[in-house]
Amino acid sequence: MTRFLDSDAMGDEELVERTLRPQYLREYIGQDKVKDQLKIFIEAAKLRDESLDHVLLFGPPGLGKTTMAFVIANELGVNLKQTSGPAIEKSGDLVAILNDLEPGDVLFIDEIHRMPMAVEEVLYSAMEDFYIDIMIGAGETSRSVHLDLPPFTLIGATTRAGMLSNPLRARFGITGHMEYYEENDLTEIIERTADIFEMKITYEAASELARRSRGTPRIANRLLKRVRDYAQIMGDGLIDDNITDKALTMLDVDHEGLDYVDQKILRTMIEMYNGGPVGLGTLSVNIAEERDTVEDMYEPYLIQKGFIMRTRTGRVATVKAYEHLGYQRFDK
C-alpha cells in the first residue's frame, strides 16, 4: 500500500519540486525565523565581499532544506554544486569536489550525517582554513601535498543533527532549524502550486488540505495532485472542500493528518501496552517497521501534534490519542 504521507520524495517528485522551487528569500513561503536570520547574514557577507559562513540546515524531511540551499546560492549570486553524504564514499571523492570549486561557490551536501568519518575529517581543514592535505603515492614513497582552496560556503542538510560529530557541527557558523509549517503558510504554498499547474481550488479546500498535510510542503503538493485526480474523475475538476474531504478519506488521511501507519502505532500502544510506556524497538517490531523509520518518519509528527509523549521509560500514548481513536482511557 502506498503511504501518501511519507515525507521522503517519491517517483518524479524531485523534478516537480525543482519546477516549484522559489528562487529568492522573498519568494520562499514560511520558515520566517530562518529567512530573517539568513537575510542579515547574506547581506553582511555581500557587503564585506566575503563568502558566507558555513550553514547547517536541520529538520524533518520535506520541509525545504534543499530549496533553501538553492535560494541561498541565488541570493549570493554564486554557483551551487550539489552532492550527498552517501554519494561521497571515500576521501578522494570529496577532494575532487573541493578541488573543482570556484571562489564563493556554495557546496551543498544533503544527508551530511551519512558521510563516512574518514571523509568528514577531510572537511575540517577545508571548512576552517580553506585547505586540505592529501597523500600522494603509497608506502615509503608517499608524501603529503598541501592544496589551497578558494573561499566557499558549505551548506549541510540533515534530518539527524544529533548524529553529527561535535567537531563537524562546531565548524558551522550558521544553523537553521527547519520546522513544520504553519497551516496558513501551507495553504499559501498549496494555492501557489495550484496556480502554477492551472488547477482550480477554493481557499477552503486549500486550507483543509493544509490541515491534513502534516505541516510538510512535499506532502501537501503530493496530496494536491491526488485530490486533483479525484476532482477530475468524480467531479467537474473544481477542488472544493467537499471533494478534498472525500479524496483524503479515500486515501486514509484523517482530519488530524494521520494515516493508517500512524493509527497503527497508536492502536498498538493502546491495545497491547495499555498506552505505554513502550520502548521504540519493541514498538517497531510490533508494527513491522524499521526503528529508524519510526523515529524519523512517524514519531516527530505524532509528538508535535500531542498524540505521543517521550519519557525516560519509553513512549506513552496521550489522552488525545485515546480520544482521537475512540478508546476509553482507564487509569493504571
From Swiss-Prot:
* Alphabetical keyword list: ATP-binding, Cytoplasm, DNA damage, DNA recombination, DNA repair, DNA-binding, Hydrolase, Nucleotide-binding
Q: Which reaction does it catalyse?
A: ATP + H2O = ADP + phosphate + H(+)
Which top EC class is given? hydrolase
Question: Per UniProt, what is one Pfam family of this protein?
Answer: RuvB_N
Can you provide one Gene Ontology molecular function annotated for this UniProt record?
ATP binding
Q: For Mg(2+), which residues are the binding ones?
A: T66
**Binding positions (ATP):** L20, R21, G62, K65, T66, T67, E128, D129, F130, R171, Y181, R218
Task: Give Gene Ontology CC terms.
Answer: cytoplasm; Holliday junction resolvase complex
Query: InterPro entries, alphabetically?
Result: AAA+_ATPase (IPR003593), AAA_lid_4 (IPR041445), DNA_helicase_Holl-junc_RuvB (IPR004605), P-loop_NTPase (IPR027417), RuvB-like_N (IPR008824), RuvB_C (IPR008823), WH-like_DNA-bd_sf (IPR036388), WH_DNA-bd_sf (IPR036390)
Location relative to the cell: Cytoplasm
Q: What is the E.C. number? A: 3.6.4.-
| Chain residue ranges for the region called Small ATPAse domain (RuvB-S) | 182-252
User: Per the record, which residues fall in region Large ATPase domain (RuvB-L)?
Assistant: 1-181
Which Gene Ontology BP annotations are present?
DNA recombination; DNA repair
Q: Which domain of life is it from?
A: Bacteria
Region spans: Head domain (RuvB-H):
255-332
PANTHER family from the UniProt entry: HOLLIDAY JUNCTION BRANCH MIGRATION COMPLEX SUBUNIT RUVB (PTHR42848:SF1), PTHR42848
**Domain remark in the UniProt entry:** Has 3 domains, the large (RuvB-L) and small ATPase (RuvB-S) domains and the C-terminal head (RuvB-H) domain. The head domain binds DNA, while the ATPase domains jointly bind ATP, ADP or are empty depending on the state of the subunit in the translocation cycle. During a single DNA translocation step the structure of each domain remains the same, but their relative positions change.
UniProt function note = The RuvA-RuvB-RuvC complex processes Holliday junction (HJ) DNA during genetic recombination and DNA repair, while the RuvA-RuvB complex plays an important role in the rescue of blocked DNA replication forks via replication fork reversal (RFR). RuvA specifically binds to HJ cruciform DNA, conferring on it an open structure. The RuvB hexamer acts as an ATP-dependent pump, pulling dsDNA into and through the RuvAB complex. RuvB forms 2 homohexamers on either side of HJ DNA bound by 1 or 2 RuvA tetramers; 4 subunits per hexamer contact DNA at a time.
Task: State the similarity comment.
Answer: Belongs to the RuvB family.
Q: How does it assemble?
A: Homohexamer. Forms an RuvA(8)-RuvB(12)-Holliday junction (HJ) complex. HJ DNA is sandwiched between 2 RuvA tetramers; dsDNA enters through RuvA and exits via RuvB. An RuvB hexamer assembles on each DNA strand where it exits the tetramer. Each RuvB hexamer is contacted by two RuvA subunits (via domain III) on 2 adjacent RuvB subunits; this complex drives branch migration. In the full resolvosome a probable DNA-RuvA(4)-RuvB(12)-RuvC(2) complex forms which resolves the HJ.
Stated name of the protein = Holliday junction branch migration complex subunit RuvB
Taxonomic lineage? Bacteria, Bacillati, Bacillota, Bacilli, Lactobacillales
